[in-house]
């Protein structure tokens, strides 16, 4: 299965997201250029954004995710109509821009670390978040006493997501993880998925066996102390990473796809900045 790898610093300076924000914008522009021949042409009388205006629009979408700003507020600050910004975000989400870019960055990171393109094992977990009344779904998590939604995540040993699913918070982990397993199977993954004791039951075991994925639950600690076994702590760190993005603390999204898109944008921000620093360290060395 391998061991967890922690190449990045955890000091406050390493979380200065605005310091390397140009890396995020450059990565998104590169992916837009790569998708130029596959995406449908824009309809309407207005010409599409280009140049500095396009960079400003991408930065505005990132600010909505990182700062938790409202669409109308960011539209006033960047002098771009909020309807234009939201339409760009929704359109790029439908085209799968964020997922494609995230997959490319994960592959680049694994290659930079000298690892294989595909993981041999994954770690799964979930996190309950409070949601607004206008959110796409609300459920009450009796264990954590949270009314909102639940994020189901499958990550590799570096903590980067391979599959993401969201559901109301009242859905049990053993049921909410099944769509994640289908996403993993769609990527061609067949192996072991590590998780906590919530991922038990014959129905979940049969679903995993049908997809070629063996789910291995393990205890999360002893004597009331939370200490994940093995490399299970990696997914806990991933959930802590995205908690720094304010749009993902209280959920306002009206569609599941938009929430998943913001989760992907958060990891794109983390990965693109780390890749830039990794290249800088190699050059300076």
Task: Identify the residue ranges that each predicted region occupies.
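Short alpha-helical elements
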Residues: 1-285
